């Protein structure tokens, strides 16, 4: 059997960003985002922003990163890729100049034939209908909609005028509100105008002196309106499913919604199962600006952007989740345990299958050879990708140790590194106009050794990557048959640029002896048209999964929590919901009772 454990285990390249919003400070972080996934000639390809390449796999589990030809717009965001006939078509985003397209019959080696474009766009998506007609969708803004148009099949230029298809509506769609957990309401017109006038006063300009088009954009900055972006179209049983991202990539609630229509250009109605892709909790939250694909075994997958956003708003990773359509045509995505190990077979699979193993490492006792203030060792076991242990030096003798508390059978360990890069200059020239950047082209290395022990004194090697030539910062150690261990020690560590090592998650999975939790009791109360309060009576559990949906058998949305209270702000005004709370511990998952939301 093969297994995945999000984020996708691949090398994520560093960027050096000169962001004008940060006063020109050089920000250094890793990024991959906005993934387009396709199947072409039996192989799987993922094109993601800022990777300089394409990820290739034969099984959706093991991926390799291949450089793409230099003549492609590799520094442009949100690459869109589709298969049409014998060709793979590629394009990406630019705001101020026409975006060209490219096509090839050989993804890895090219050549790529250029197809001139005639207008700028951002977050593109091309869709080929069953009748051969071609449609195009784009948009990334909190002031303008997702646009759509038909394309000429020969030139791939627009036919007719663009049409506004969907717009943000955070006054009625709770999950479109910005902020952590949708905590920020849209600003009033009075608030927007007051902040806009304050901006003009601070900068010493009048509205007439602003460049064309800048006034609406600046007002949008003060509006607290969501970014509606990242369109992706799929068709199933005659219905068109227009997926879109909300409300902003820097939030834990970054996800994908869905509108449905009988026509590729609408009119569209909000899907009954909205949001479609939503993962606000767990170790690594976020599941927005993605793409959906049916594999060669008729399994649907959704691949999407996951949020870190510590060193830069665009510090992001990529996750892949089972998806599908139910008997009523509702498009769903299973993210209940979306960053736990999941079995992947070369066969048709149940998209609602549970995790292969359970989390054994949450808040376990941690020690280390040293640490920086604020980066204590216990932060490598708190299931929060935004916190980490950081050693006091870059010496390979530094170590991080976990005591599981007793002997367990361990099946997988995921070693997640964070990045704190200081005093390093980019190896090449920063390019771009609005936000200049350089993407690291060199192949860096992340090296470590994982030791195990039953008594804390006698150690054996679980995995030795101390001489690895790879740069895998979310690497996995798989022992399908299991190993007996109580103590784990990560040592002999060397990371990129010779920096002090940082570990955001030493995550351990297996199945402990014992019973699953008792059935959890809870209350769920609607508080306002778009929010609900959930309170859980504690049981012997590590955590809980709050599930909700439009019917008892359609609990397609989930929020993993490690506490007993949560306000969920992802409801749609006027819709009825059913809620269930499941409890999990190191031995299993117990389903709760389903209730109608009052």
PLM feature spans:
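Beta-rich carbohydrate-recognition and catalytic domains
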Residues: 1-223, 235-282, 297, 306-350
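Short beta-strand elements bearing conserved aromatic residues within extracellular beta-rich modules
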Residues: 149, 448-450, 544-546
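Short S/T/G- and acidic-enriched coil/turn segments that sit immediately N-terminal to beta-strands
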Residues: 257, 446, 474-476, 562-567
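Aromatic, loop-rich ligand-recognition surfaces of beta-strand-rich domains
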Residues: 382-461, 472-522, 526-527, 551, ...
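Conserved aromatic anchor
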Residues: 530-541
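Extracellular low-complexity, O-glycosylation-prone stalks/linkers
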Residues: 540-562
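Beta-strand-rich modules
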Residues: 568-589
């Amino acid at each position: 059997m093969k297994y995945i454990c999000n984020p996708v285990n691949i090398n994520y390249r560093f960027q050096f960003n000169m962001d004008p919003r940060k006063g020109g400070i050089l920000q250094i972080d890793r990024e991959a985002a906005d993934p387009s996934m396709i199947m072409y000639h039996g192989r799987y390809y993922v094109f993601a922003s800022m990777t300089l390449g394409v990820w290739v796999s034969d099984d959706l589990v093991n991926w390799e990163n291949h450089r793409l030809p230099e003549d492609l717009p590799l520094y442009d965001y949100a690459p869109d890729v589709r298969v049409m006939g014998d060709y793979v078509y590629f394009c990406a985003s630019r705001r101020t100049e026409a975006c060209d397209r490219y096509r090839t019959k050989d993804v890895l080696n090219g050549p790529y034939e250029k197809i001139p474009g005639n207008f700028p766009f951002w977050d593109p998506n091309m869709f080929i209908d069953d009748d051969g007609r071609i449609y195009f969708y784009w948009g990334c803004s909190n002031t303008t909609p997702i646009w759509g148009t038909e394309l000429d099949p020969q030139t791939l230029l627009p036919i007719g005028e663009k049409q506004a298809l969907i717009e943000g509506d955070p006054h009625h769609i709770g999950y479109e509100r910005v902020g952590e957990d949708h905590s920020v309401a849209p600003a009033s017109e009075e608030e927007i105008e007051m902040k806009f006038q304050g901006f003009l006063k601070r900068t010493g300009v009048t509205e007439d002196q602003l460049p064309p088009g800048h006034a609406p954009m600046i007002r949008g900055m003060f509006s607290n309106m969501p970014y509606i972006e990242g369109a992706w179209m799929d068709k199933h049983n005659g219905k068109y499913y227009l997926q879109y991202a909300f409300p902003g990539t820097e939030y834990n609630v970054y996800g994908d919604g869905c509108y449905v229509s009988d026509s590729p250009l609408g009119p569209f109605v909000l899907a009954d199962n909205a949001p479609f892709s939503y993962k606000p909790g767990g170790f690594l939250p976020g599941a927005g600006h993605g793409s959906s694909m049916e594999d060669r075994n008729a399994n649907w997958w959704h691949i999407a952007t996951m949020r870190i956003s510590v060193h830069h708003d665009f510090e992001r990773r990529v996750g892949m989740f089972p998806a599908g359509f139910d008997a009523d045509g509702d498009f769903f995505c299973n993210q209940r345990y979306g960053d736990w190990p999941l079995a992947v077979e070369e066969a048709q699979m149940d998209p609602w299958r549970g995790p292969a193993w359970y989390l054994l490492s949450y808040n376990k006792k941690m020690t280390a050879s040293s640490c920086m203030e604020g980066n204590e060792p216990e932060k490598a076991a708190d299931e929060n990708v935004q916190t980490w242990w950081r050693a006091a030096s870059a010496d390979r003798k530094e170590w991080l140790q976990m005591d599981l508390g007793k002997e367990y059978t361990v099946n997988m360990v995921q070693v997640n590194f964070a990045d704190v890069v200081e005093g390093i200059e980019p190896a090449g020239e920063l390019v771009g106009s609005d936000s200049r950047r350089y993407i690291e082209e060199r192949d860096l290395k992340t090296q470590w050794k994982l030791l195990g022990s039953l008594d804390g004194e006698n150690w054996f090697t679980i995995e030795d990557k101390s001489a690895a030539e790879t740069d895998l910062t979310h690497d996995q150690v798989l022992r399908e048959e299991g190993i007996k261990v109580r103590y784990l020690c990560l040592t002999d560590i060397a990371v990129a640029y010779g920096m002090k090592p940082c570990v955001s998650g030493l995550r351990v999975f297996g199945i402990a002896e014992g019973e699953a939790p008792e059935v959890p009791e809870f209350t769920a109360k609607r508080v306002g048209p778009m929010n609900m309060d959930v309170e859980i009576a504690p049981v012997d559990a590590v955590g809980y999964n709050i599930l909700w949906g439009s019917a008892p058998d359609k609990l397609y949305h989930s929020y993993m929590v490690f506490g007993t209270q949560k306000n969920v702000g992802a409801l749609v005004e006027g819709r009825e919901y059913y809620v269930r709370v499941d409890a999990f511990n190191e031995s299993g998952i117990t389903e709760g009772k389903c209730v109608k939301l009052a």
